């Protein structure tokens, strides 16, 4: 199914009654998802749309997630917005290159705190929500780790677990964005959204710690230290 090709919707949605919706990183315009949401509204049998949103987005109209949540609710679809903090996988994914090659973390948030969450924990919670659709209709869950840490602490944990000195570069936002585009070759639209999210973090938009994960899953979310231990190979050459 292609978001920009409504002709692909009917076959993909045949016999579907529950939907997990995630905005592709390269689609910064929320209107790109509107045709699919309209198609879901016409299905008449959708029990739940679980949208992977963003922590704090209900109070922040700037990220595209805010408008997408509104589209879903305005369509009258039964929804469960999953609003996670920053994925731990950001450190083992898009930012792993600098750690592998230069032992540096290039993220422009100064000393701001982040309540990292493992994507695996998000996946488990989302699966439960979809399986228990009627128990989670018209709800929202803010999903975070059990603690908020800054990137100096991230660097310290990486150093301790990987056995080498990792430092936090603490770049300016303009430098980081130019680096991602010019040196890393990342897509401009992707870097625009990433820069916007880190600007939110810079102004304390990612430090909130919640207990929603534990309330739904009846266990604690994975710690960042355990995540590093489980994924140490991600930062090795």
Regions found by a protein language model. Name each.
Residues 14, 25-34, 38-48, 54-167, ...:
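Oxidoreductase cofactor-interface core, primarily capturing Rossmann-like NAD(P)-dependent enzymes
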Residues 174-237:
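A hydrophobic C-terminal alpha-helical subdomain
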